[in-house]
Amino acid sequence: MRNIKTYLSVAPVLATLWFGSLAGLLIEINRLFPDALAFPFFSF
């Protein structure tokens, strides 16, 4: 039971950190490359 409580207290914190950093990364990419639907270095 203690392991379940530890998991339930750690998982939301890790999810918040992950989604927060992902949102920050997307915001910075959109700030550096505005309105980029397709990046030029990905086109072959």
Curated annotation (Swiss-Prot):
Organism expressing this protein natively: Illicium oligandrum (Star anise)
Gene3D superfamilies: Single helix bin
Its job: May help in the organization of the PsaE and PsaF subunits.
Keyword Cytoplasm: no
Keywords carried by this UniProt record: Chloroplast, Membrane, Photosynthesis, Photosystem I, Plastid, Thylakoid, Transmembrane, Transmembrane helix
Coarse class of the protein's main subcellular location: plastid
Membrane topology according to the record: Single-pass membrane protein
Recorded coiled-coil stretches: none
Primary gene name: psaJ
A cellular component annotation (GO) from this entry: chloroplast thylakoid membrane
Family indicated by similarity: Belongs to the PsaJ family.
The protein, known as: Photosystem I reaction center subunit IX
InterPro entries found in the cross-reference section: PSI_PsaJ, PSI_PsaJ_sf
